[in-house]
Amino acid sequence: MRTTYDFAPLWRSTIGFDRLFDLVDAAQQAGTEDNYPPCNVERLSEDRYQISLAVAGFSADEIAITAEQSVLTVEGRKSEKQQREFLYQGISSRPFKRQFNLADYVQVKGASFDNGLLQIELVREIPEAMKPRRISISGSSASNVRQIDGKAA
């Protein structure tokens, strides 16, 4: 038996901790969330990522991928063309919906489907205005400094 807690009264009295409470809420829901189909999230390089989902038994036209704002959604629904009689069914064909929260400036570049494995390529593209840049320092250099010799009166 699982106990759920209502943090709403606590949230009303705090300002600036929205992200922290989102993480607590996400951790609480993680146990109740369906983790089908299994997936891997890989970092291919500094700014390239790949999500791989094991969707055996589905075809490419039975899967829909949508990216809306910062959420990537993968949905699958098996279309049964004919009734078959299984003696044992180990390959799942139930409908699914997986959502991935994307970080800022992460874009979906493409997807491929091969041998029951759906691979989604992601790239992080930070705008030029947001990238750090080096600022040169101008001013007098050491060669322009003159030393004045003299006695103070």
UniProtKB/Swiss-Prot annotation:
It comes from the Bacteria. The keyword Glycoprotein does not apply. It holds the Pfam family HSP20. SUPFAM superfamilies: HSP20-like chaperones. Keywords: Stress response. Residues 30-140 form the sHSP domain. InterPro entries: A-crystallin/Hsp20_dom, ACD_IbpA/B, HSP20-like_chaperone. GO terms for cellular component: cytoplasm. CDD domains: ACD_IbpA-B_like (cd06470). Belongs to the small heat shock protein (HSP20) family. This is Small heat shock protein HspB. The lineage of its organism: Bacteria, Pseudomonadati, Pseudomonadota, Alphaproteobacteria, Hyphomicrobiales.
